[in-house]
């Protein structure tokens, strides 16, 4: 999702010498394949957006896989970029790197100040490792490797799998299927109280290209809107966009996840960037993408 959005943004801005690889074409967990790719292509600027991702269920059921796969692919790409003289690399992490009870909104400086959220600790530790490896290469070898920490993302090419997707695409699929089947109610996990922030993926892509051209530094840059809503409010908004008119119930025996996740985006704003897509508009665009690409629901 993120990689394709960055390609769209680069093309929109007139860039033409763009090299991409799908997972089928290049397995980033294979060190030999990654090294061969960098030795052959010698990319000067690298956006590292690839990751093994998933929602609460996937993270809880595959802790070791999430940590191993993400650490391996990150280290393979970042190290091969350094070995082959890459001029600049941009590493994309996640807001889950910040402590569970971090002061809100979360500033970049609160990294590693207290305990992580247990439901996605493995993924968070892997992302922190990638971020720190970029920082240490900068300090030891004078590289220009930067990192961006996005809030919850959504948009075209999202993963709508019923158990392995994040909350917003999962809600889109559930309410679409409920509407199509004529269901009178939908039950959601938790109690709907957690506060979340959402950024349309094309807005993130715009920031990524902006930072590649305008920012250098060891400290990461938060990517978000600076606006939040409860999961209950999000659920009602998705139901409204899709046209589901039944009852929404909550199963409080299921986990809520982190109680609040709002990024402080003042750093990005001071650099001259702000988001463009409001949440309801983005959900409509995402639902159109879901309807136009039904096979995505099978992933």
What would you call each of these model-derived segments?
Residues 1-159, 285, 292-293:
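N-terminal Rossmann-like NAD(P)+-binding domain of SDR-like oxidoreductases, especially those catalyzing
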Residues 129, 133-137, 167-171, 234, ...:
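Hydrophobic alpha-helix immediately C-terminal to the catalytic Tyr-X-X-X-Lys motif of short-chain
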Residues 119-123, 151-166, 190-202, 225-227:
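Glycine-rich "substrate-gating" loop/helix at the edge of Rossmann-like oxidoreductase active sites
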Residues 95, 171, 226:
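Conserved short acidic donor-positioning loop in nucleotide-sugar-dependent glycosyltransferases
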């Amino acid at each position: 999702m993120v990689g394709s959005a960055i390609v769209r943004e680069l093309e929109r801005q007139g860039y033409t010498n763009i090299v991409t690889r799908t997972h089928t074409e290049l397995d980033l967990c294979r060190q030999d394949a990654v090294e061969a790719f960098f030795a052959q292509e010698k990319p000067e600027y690298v956006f590292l957006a690839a990751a093994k991702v998933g929602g609460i269920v996937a993270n809880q059921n595959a802790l070791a896989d999430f940590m191993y796969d993400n650490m391996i692919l990150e280290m393979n790409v970042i190290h091969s970029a350094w070995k082959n003289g890459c001029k600049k690399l941009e590493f994309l992490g996640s807001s889950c790197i910040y402590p569970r009870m971090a002061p809100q909104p979360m500033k970049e400086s609160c990294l590693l100040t207290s305990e992580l959220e247990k439901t996605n600790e493995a993924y968070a530790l892997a992302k922190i490792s990638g971020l720190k490896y970029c920082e240490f290469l900068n300090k030891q070898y004078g590289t220009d490797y930067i990192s961006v920490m996005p809030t919850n993302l959504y948009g075209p090419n999202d993963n709508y799998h019923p158990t392995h997707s994040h909350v917003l695409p999962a809600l889109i699929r559930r309410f679409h299927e409920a509407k199509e089947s004529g269901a009178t109610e939908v039950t959601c996990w938790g109690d709907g109280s957690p506060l979340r922030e959402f950024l349309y993926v094309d807005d993130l892509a715009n920031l990524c290209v902006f930072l590649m051209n305008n920012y250098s530094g060891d400290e990461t840059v938060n990517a978000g809107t600076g606006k939040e809503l409860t999961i209950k409010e999000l659920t009602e908004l998705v139901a409204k966009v899709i046209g589901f008119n039944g009852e929404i119930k909550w199963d409080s025996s299921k986990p809520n996840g982190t109680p609040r996740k709002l990024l402080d985006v003042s750093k990005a704003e001071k650099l001259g960037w702000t988001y463009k897509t409001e949440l309801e508009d983005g959900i409509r665009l995402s639902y159109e993408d879901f309807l136009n690409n039904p096979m995505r629901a099978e992933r």
